[in-house]
Amino acid sequence: MPRVLLHCCCAPCASSVLEYLTQYFQVTVLWYNPNLYPQAEFDRRFRALVELIEKMGLADKVDILAEPWKNQDYLRRIKGLEDEPEHGLRCTECFRVRLLETARLCKHYGYDYFCSTLTLSRHKNAELINDIGEELARASGTSWLPSDFKKRDGENRSIELCEEHNIYRQLYCGCEYSMRRRIEVGESMGQTPGESTGGAV
């Protein structure tokens, strides 16, 4: 089987993607998400990813390459973009910093492809993510595996898998700015931030 280095942003997005890709690839999951804030949330999401892989019976099929919390990597890249709206230039740089590291490690370890679970969410622009992946692949001499994992009912399947295995599903995308936005929205609706039963925003 060809080998793919799969950047995983969270357990929910990884669920149906792993179910699909492990049929055709030898998958190594890369946990590199310096955008996540605070560190306790970073740690919680990583534990959820490991738990998911175990509960799906993929522990013998999927390797995990995990990097520690490096929030400064993210903050350096988005300097000057702090006030950008959600889905704006700050988010584009967030995609780029994670895929840049994925491309680097793909080259270093000799994987056949690199890819990301980011395209599963309906809140993410798959065309933009694929464009960044292709650009970084050309620059690094690697191969990007294009995807739009939300197709073929991928996002709904991820919800089913998380409910089946009782996997933590976060309420905000991940960075400090999206967390603040979620709190503001929740307060305006009289809600208290907590775990999601309906998927990440």
Predicted regions: what they are:
Residues 1-19, 24-201:
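Nucleotide-activated chemistry modules centered on ATP-dependent adenylation/adenylyltransferase
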